[in-house]
Amino acid sequence: MPNHLRTYLVDHAALTLAVLELAKRARNSNPGGELGGFLTGIIPTLEAERKTLKEMLRRIKGSDSPLKNFAAWGAEKAGRFKLNDSLFSYSDLSRVVELEALLAATEVKTAMWDALATLAMTRSDFRDLDLGGYLRKNKTMGEKLRAFHRTAAHRALRTEEP
């Protein structure tokens, strides 16, 4: 019989690894300033999310997948090769693309924490985990990412008036 919960947790643990790597890359490309501070601030939350997913796996007698983790890690690294009108340096468009990827991942993680928080209400082995806290943090994270994205997109995509 398939263990859908295990597969779900393994897949999302791999996703959180990719998101964590992307957040670190974006932070390193945007040191200082409000965006850099925000990205620095979300990294501990992303690390805690990953740790919680791994703990949930442990509780259901599952384990992390090195193959899926490697694939997620590799996908994030491969994403660095997207050309953004600047072959060897970071561009304003790079920032927009990174923020869009973080936004998309945050939307997925928001849905995940919602599903897991709902599940935890019916499972005694998960009740002590603050899954609703992660849900709230991801909603807030998404709102802030949208604001940073709006500013970055305006800067990168504006054109001179004719």
Language-model features, listed with the residues they occupy:
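Juxtamembrane/interfacial segments around transmembrane helices
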Residues: 92-95, 152-154
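Inter-helical turn/loop segments and adjacent helix faces that build the functional surface
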Residues: 25-37, 60-61, 116-132
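Carboxylate-rich helix-loop segments that flank metal/cofactor sites and access channels
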Residues: 60-92
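Amphipathic alpha-helices that form helix-helix packing interfaces
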Residues: 12, 19, 26, 49, ...
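Alpha-helical bundle segments that constitute or directly flank the non-heme di-iron/ferroxidase center
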Residues: 1-30, 97-120
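Preference for long, well-ordered alpha-helical segments
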Residues: 102-162
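Low-complexity intrinsically disordered segments
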Residues: 56, 63, 161-162
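Alpha-helical scaffold segments that form or flank carboxylate-/histidine-based iron centers
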Residues: 4-12, 33-55, 98-102, 127-138
